[in-house]
């Protein structure tokens, strides 16, 4: 999971904090709490048309980002 990074951020276009998920310094996804549910937005990869990495690893990163976001409110 060393290629992934999770950043909890306050963005000007969001009321609540978000969890940004990056892979090799490029943003892959964002988890937000703008509604009563957690929502994930997955971004396309401009250079290659798609992202490719281990499903198990990505699931772990998503869960870690979710837990960090919930912990900070």
Language-model segments: which ranges?
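Poly-acidic low-complexity segments
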Residues: 3-7, 37, 54, 66
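Negatively charged, low-complexity tracts enriched in Asp/Glu with abundant Ser/Thr
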Residues: 1-20
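A short, structured beta-strand/loop element
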Residues: 16-47
